[in-house]
Amino acid sequence: MTKIQVLEIFSMVLSAGKSQKYSISFDYDTEFNELNVFLYCCEDSGSIDVVDYAISSQLSLDELFDKLREWTSIIAKDRKLQERKKK
């Protein structure tokens, strides 16, 4: 499995989730020949913030999986916080 396939699957999982609050985007930097990946958070107010980013060409596949696990943890913590606020 290639890095781009892993990122595309992660993106599909995010878009299929209950909340469309988080998304990722890819940006290929032709000057440096690097694939940049950004994790975005879309707030209720309409603002879109960059939560984190990675330069996937500088990461091994294992390191990329670690980064995606880290992002999943960020999203899960935020969802738990939002659920507590609703109660």
Residue map of PLM features:
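Negatively charged, low-complexity tracts enriched in Asp/Glu with abundant Ser/Thr
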Residues: 1-32, 43-87
